[in-house]
């Protein structure tokens, strides 16, 4: 382990040393560019564009372009990037992750690679976690880019397609990760190319890259349509589930958060719903509703996993503590929670398009990111995104004091100690930021502080709209701020007058998160830019992490110490080591899950790419689509004829071929059964294709205007493809949910999913061919065709 860490640090040092030489070149232009007039400095932008057009590369012009962006920032923003920020900028340009501590100026660091890459004219996306940060950075940094002659676009959810198109056509586009993903999906659902908004995905710099590419990696972006209602079944399942007893009727496995009925529970369900066998095929809808109701009632916790506001169930992001507006749990879990909470049950939805962030961001030609905390996930970034994590040195040495964890026997004794600590700091005027893992604990702590007359601000999923304002004041003398994990990422906590003398900002963690990275983010709020600061984590044996993964060694250690007093406090390196070992175990599990998600999602990615590519060819076509439609008809004819001409001619089923032809291709007068008799299979295929060719020619005559024929073909293909594709997405979802339950003995579920998924995809393509054949051959021509 020690050798691994040593090589890790040395490889970073080597990389930083290499980039330091490039930074020297950037800094060598400092005096020359500071003497240029504004006009001369601004004239560098068209000069660089010309040089790129004449064959120079972005790497060739990097030192000069970075130096121009740096001098421009000094003149326009009053900020001059430090040497370490230049190194961070080079890291981003090279498609890697710059790990920069809080307060080291990530936003300013990004201006140099953004400017350089925007010169190529293919678009640069700056990606943030929320619209507040997108708007702020587009406005503030936009001044610099505009001054240097580049256009800046802001892509917000509320914008019209025209406004979005303008934003994407700008040299630099600011957007949230979710809006980028949804725009990509919507672009692949349009029926007219003019409705598309995005350009090809070129270069993205992702701010808070760990939050987007790790924490949200498994979150699928889903565009849904309404499906059929089954409200009554959710209510019945909920009423039944509420009568069950833990252990007797159902069992919960907390480490995996899975729940299942016992034999007794199954018996009760069969009696309650009047069934012989709960797991019969015809009862799958009911078992699905029961599974979701069990999860909703006994695993999903109010004010931790979700909150209820104004009669609506809203998801709480477990990593940021924010309410995820507009997001709903899939597979009926959201409806089951609505039944549990007695609020209106909203209609279930059908997925029409979906993609995960992992697969969306891997489509960029070049991807980079910045964050204060990424080293703990370095392997994942390298394996999944092919990005290295480079730790950028701080501009000034870190002066923060990170104290060892303290452990209490109970939640009550822990919170008692936390309140005592906060109160003493408040009384001497030292600002304190208190991090909690859940909304529930932030509200409990708030009540305890009220009882102790300590004024404070609370920042959690219920009032995140005040986030920037609360965080801005968190460094003032005597300020006490309670925040869930998000702790205002993206907004710096600046120290007020006199606070440095009091020891700077104190950060108190009320429990360890299951991810070390989230703990490090909280620590990083203190001691920015060389300021003093202090951090302390409080834990109890009743904390979630300790309950789920607290080792036997900790329990044995406490027994040996004979600790029974509620206020007893333990501070031991062994405890800290055990906690970190538990965190590493959880991180390993989470990484394996994300990796598995990606392997499953790659099956859908390949299929999605095939469908989207073919769909795009149809939308972009400017000539007739005969080259697309005739092969579809030919494949359908071949399949039907081959199916019914197996073995001896006496066994052939010519009636079935005739039925297909008259229902899907021609009228009964055109083709009698006698015309098929006495012919070989190849001759039958040729005869049917002759009808297809004649039909095509007739339609072309009827639609003498070339555009009308093309429009008719596009209508037919797009309608069929879209309907079959959305059904296929749904079927693949169901396959994925059921594949683990199948009794395949020693078979690998992923291999089964890949093989079955491929078979279903082939089947869907056949269905598309068949439906297109029938619709094209049988459709009556109407004027004013619209897609």
Curated annotation (Swiss-Prot):
Its main location: membrane. InterPro entries: Helicase_ATP-bd, Helicase_C-like, P-loop_NTPase, SecA, SecA_CS, SecA_DEAD, SecA_motor_DEAD, SecA_preprotein_X-link_dom. One of its GO terms (molecular function) is ATP binding. Keywords: ATP-binding, Cell membrane, Cytoplasm, Membrane, Nucleotide-binding, Protein transport, Translocase, Translocation, Transport. One of its GO terms (cellular component) is cell envelope Sec protein transport complex. SUPFAM superfamilies: Helical scaffold and wing domains of SecA, P-loop containing nucleoside triphosphate hydrolases, Pre-protein crosslinking domain of SecA. It is found in: Cell membrane; Cytoplasm. The keyword Protein transport applies. It is a peripheral membrane protein. One of its GO terms (biological process) is intracellular protein transmembrane transport. ATP binds at residues 85, 103-107, 492. Its EC number is 7.4.2.8. It comes from the Bacteria. The keyword 4Fe-4S does not apply. Pfam families: P-loop_SecA, SecA_DEAD, SecA_PP_bind, SecA_SW. It catalyses: ATP + H2O + cellular proteinSide 1 = ADP + phosphate + cellular proteinSide 2. Belongs to the SecA family. Part of the Sec protein translocase complex. Interacts with the SecYEG preprotein conducting channel. Has a central role in coupling the hydrolysis of ATP to the transfer of proteins into and across the cell membrane, serving as an ATP-driven molecular motor driving the stepwise translocation of polypeptide chains across the membrane. Monomer and homodimer. Part of the essential Sec protein translocation apparatus which comprises SecA, SecYEG and auxiliary proteins SecDF. Other proteins may also be involved. This is Protein translocase subunit SecA. It comes from Latilactobacillus sakei subsp. sakei (strain 23K).
């Amino acid at each position: 382990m020690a050798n691994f860490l040593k090589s890790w640090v040395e490889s970073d040092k080597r990389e930083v040393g290499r980039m330091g030489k490039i930074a020297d070149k950037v800094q060598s232009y400092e005096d020359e560019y500071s003497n240029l007039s504004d006009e001369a400095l601004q004239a560098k932008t068209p000069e660089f564009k010309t040089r790129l057009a004449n064959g120079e590369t972005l790497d060739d012009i990097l030192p000069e372009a970075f130096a121009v962006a740096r001098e421009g920032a000094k003149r326009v923003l009053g900020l001059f990037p430090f040497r370490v920020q230049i190194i961070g900028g080079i890291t981003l340009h090279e498609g890697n992750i710059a790990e920069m501590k809080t307060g080291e100026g990530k936003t300013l660091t990004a201006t140099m690679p953004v400017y350089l890459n925007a010169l190529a004219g293919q678009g640069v996306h700056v990606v943030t976690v929320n619209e507040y940060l997108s708007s702020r950075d587009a406005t503030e940094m936009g001044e610099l880019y505009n001054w240097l002659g580049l256009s800046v676009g802001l892509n917000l959810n509320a914008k019209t397609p025209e406004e979005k198109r303008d934003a994407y056509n700008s040299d630099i586009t600011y957007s949230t990760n979710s809006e980028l993903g949804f725009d990509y999906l919507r672009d692949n659902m349009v029926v007219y190319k003019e409705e598309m908004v995005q350009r090809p995905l070129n270069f993205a710099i992702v701010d808070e890259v760990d939050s987007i590419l790790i924490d949200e990696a498994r979150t699928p972006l889903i565009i849904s349509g309404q499906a059929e209602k089954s409200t009554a079944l959710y209510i019945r399942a909920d009423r039944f589930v509420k009568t069950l007893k833990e252990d007797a009727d159902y069992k919960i496995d907390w480490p995996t958060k899975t729940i299942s009925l016992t034999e007794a529970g199954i018996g009760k369900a069969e009696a309650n719903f009047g069934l012989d066998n709960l797991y019969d095929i015809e009862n799958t809808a009911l078992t699905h509703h029961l599974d979701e109701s069990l999860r909703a009632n006994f695993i999903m916790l109010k004010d931790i996993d979700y909150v209820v506001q104004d009669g609506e169930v809203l998801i709480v992001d477990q990593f940021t503590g924010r309410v995820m507006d507009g997001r709903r749990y899939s597979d009926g879990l959201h409806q089951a929670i609505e039944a549990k909470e007695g609020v209106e049950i909203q209609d279930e939805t059908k997925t029409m398009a979906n993609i995960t962030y992992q697969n969306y961001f891997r489509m960029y030609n070049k991807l980079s990111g910045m964050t204060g905390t990424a080293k703990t996930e370095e392997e994942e970034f390298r394996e999944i995104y092919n990005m290295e994590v480079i730790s950028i040195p701080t501009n000034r040495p870190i002066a923060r004091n990170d104290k060892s964890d303290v452990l209490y026997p109970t939640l009550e004794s822990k919170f008692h100690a936390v309140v005592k600590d906060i109160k003493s700091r408040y009384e001497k005027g030292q600002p304190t930021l208190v991090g909690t893992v859940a909304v529930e604990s932030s509200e409990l702590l708030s009540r305890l502080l009220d009882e102790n007359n300590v004024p404070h601000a609370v920042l959690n999923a219920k009032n995140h709209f005040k986030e920037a304002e609360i965080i801005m004041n968190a460094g003032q003398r005597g300020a006490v701020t309670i925040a869930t994990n998000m702790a205002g990422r993206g907004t710096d906590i600046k120290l007020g007058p006199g606070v440095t003398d009091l020891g700077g900002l104190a950060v108190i963690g009320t429990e360890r998160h299951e991810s070390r990275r989230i703990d490090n983010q909280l620590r990083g709020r203190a001691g920015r830019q060389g300021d003093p600061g202090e951090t302390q984590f409080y834990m109890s044996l009743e904390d979630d992490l300790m309950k789920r993964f607290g080792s036997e060694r900790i329990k044995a250690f406490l027994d040996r110490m004979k600790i029974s007093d509620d206020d007893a406090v333990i501070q031991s390196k062994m405890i800290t080591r055990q906690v970190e070992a538990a965190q590493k175990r959880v991180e390993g599990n989470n990484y394996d899950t994300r990796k598995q998600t990606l392997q499953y999602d790659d099956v859908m990615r390949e299929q999605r790419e095939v469908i989207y590519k073919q769909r795009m060819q149809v939308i972009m076509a400017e000539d007739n689509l005969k080259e697309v439609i005739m092969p579809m008809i030919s494949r359908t004819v071949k399949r039907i004829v081959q199916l019914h001409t197996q073995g001896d001619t006496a066994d052939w089923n010519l009636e079935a071929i005739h039925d297909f032809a008259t229902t899907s291709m021609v009228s009964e007068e055109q083709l009698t059964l006698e015309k098929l008799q006495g012919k070989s299979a190849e001759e039958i295929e040729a005869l049917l294709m002759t009808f297809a060719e004649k039909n095509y020619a007739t339609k072309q005559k009827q639609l003498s205007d070339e555009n009308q024929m093309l429009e008719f073909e596009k209508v037919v293909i797009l309608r069929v493809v879209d309907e079959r594709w959305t059904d296929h997405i749904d079927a693949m979802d169901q396959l994925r949910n059921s594949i683990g339950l199948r009794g395949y003995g020693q078979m690998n579920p992923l291999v089964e999913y890949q093989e079955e998924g491929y078979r279903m995809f082939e089947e869907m393509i056949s269905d598309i061919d068949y439906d297109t054949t029938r619709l094209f051959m049988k459709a009556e021509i109407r004027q004013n065709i619209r897609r």
